[in-house]
Swiss-Prot record:
UniProt GO BP: cell wall organization; peptidoglycan biosynthetic process; regulation of cell shape; response to antibiotic
InterPro entries in alphabetical order: UppP (IPR003824)
Other comments on record: Bacitracin is thought to be involved in the inhibition of peptidoglycan synthesis by sequestering undecaprenyl diphosphate, thereby reducing the pool of lipid carrier available.
UniProt keywords, alphabetically: Antibiotic resistance, Cell membrane, Cell shape, Cell wall biogenesis/degradation, Hydrolase, Membrane, Peptidoglycan synthesis, Transmembrane, Transmembrane helix
Organism the protein comes from: Mycolicibacterium paratuberculosis (strain ATCC BAA-968 / K-10) (Mycobacterium paratuberculosis)
HAMAP family to which the protein is assigned, alphabetical: Undec_diphosphatase
Reaction catalysis annotation: di-trans,octa-cis-undecaprenyl diphosphate + H2O = di-trans,octa-cis-undecaprenyl phosphate + phosphate + H(+)
Name the record gives this protein: Undecaprenyl-diphosphatase
Family to which this protein belongs: Belongs to the UppP family.
Function: Catalyzes the dephosphorylation of undecaprenyl diphosphate (UPP). Confers resistance to bacitracin.
Lineage: Bacteria, Bacillati, Actinomycetota, Actinomycetes, Mycobacteriales
One of the record's GO cellular component terms: plasma membrane
Transmembrane segments: 18-38, 55-75, 103-123, 130-150, 187-207, 225-245, 246-266, 284-304
Length: 305
């Protein structure tokens, strides 16, 4: 991607990133597959596997915008969570649900943070290609469907200890209180599932929702915990690479980055608003079908080209 990237292209990519980052369909997998399937200049300019691609600087702005959308949508939760975190440090113990939820997010973020520092560039350069991305997208669909199947088998047993007052409690704060009842080790396991999202085609939100379902959470609570977990890691990934945005890779694309970031923010906000309502009554199955079909069809298309 060079300075000739049009504003229309920047807005389209930004909007696509904002939606696919939060929908359980893998933003990285689509970022690899869509340019390859479209071909032409898109395949050349929008490469995530090239080590010095300006597209990587563009993606930094989109990540920061997506994280900002999550912070705005969940701002009440983050006020309570941050207050709980600092309160626990001050008192040197965990006393309230907000304090416990804060530490669940901390311990759930550490594994993927360390893995990302060690493996992100390796995975992106070696696996950030169309065929691996299509294969992992297919596997993502299988994982989402398997999560639903296992959820139906274990739900009657798993829901009792994890969510004792689920039918009586309603609202965002009630959901946070239910999440705070998770043992810390379960928070680590659910958060560690994000490591798989370093693979192009595996969805961060999808795999953490599946992990939450396997550990006895409802769809609503699993999705909420997934989005709360995603916020610090997406923000950290963007902030960590901000020097690339203001370095040589970002030269000449400032306007496009701004346009794409605005589109990403708006679409990410609308996406999380929709999904938090969707998972109150619905499941991962439609996304599983989409990923399996899209991944399988992409493999066939790439093989026949």
């Amino acid at each position: 991607m060079t300075a000739h990237l049009s504003y229309v292209e920047a807005v389209v990519v930004g909007a696509f990133q904002g939606v696919t980052e939060l929908f359980p369909v893998s933003s990285l997998g689509h970022a690899v597959l869509v340019p390859a399937l479209v071909g032409g200049r898109w395949a050349q300019d929008l490469s995530v596997s090239a080590h010095r691609s300006p597209y990587l600087a563009f993606i930094v702005g989109l990540h920061v915008a997506t994280a900002a959308a999550l912070l705005v949508f969940f701002w009440r939760d983050w006020v309570r969570i941050l207050a709980g975190f600092f309160s626990s440090l001050r008192h040197r113990r965990i006393r309230t649900p907000d304090e416990r939820l804060a530490w669940l997010i901390v311990v759930g973020t550490i594994p993927v943070g360390l893995a990302g520092l060690a493996l992100e560039q390796l995975f992106r350069t070696t696996l950030g290609k169309p065929v691996p991305a299509a294969a992992f997208l297919l596997l993502n669909g299988v994982a989402l469907y398997a999560g639903e199947v296992l959820r139906r088998r274990v739900a009657p047993v798993a829901d009792e200890p994890a969510v004792p007052d689920a039918e009586q409690q309603h609202g965002d704060e009630a959901s946070d209180n239910r999440l705070a009842q998770l043992p810390l080790r379960r928070g680590v396991l659910i958060g560690a599932a994000q490591i798989l999202a370093l693979l192009p085609g595996i969805s961060r939100s999808g795999i953490t929702i599946v992990a939450g379902l396997w550990r006895g959470l409802s769809h609503e609570d699993a999705a909420r915990f997934s989005f709360l977990l995603a916020t610090p890691i997406i923000l950290a990934a963007g902030v960590y690479k901000i020097p690339e945005l203001f370095g040589p890779l970002g030269a000449g694309i400032g306007g496009q980055v701004l346009a794409g970031s605005i589109a990403s923010f708006v679409c990410a906000y609308l996406a999380v608003r929709y999904l938090t309502r969707y998972f109150q009554t619905r499941t991962l199955t439609p996304f599983a079908i989409y990923c399996a079909v899209a991944g399988g069809a992409s493999l066939v298309w790439l093989a026949l080209r």
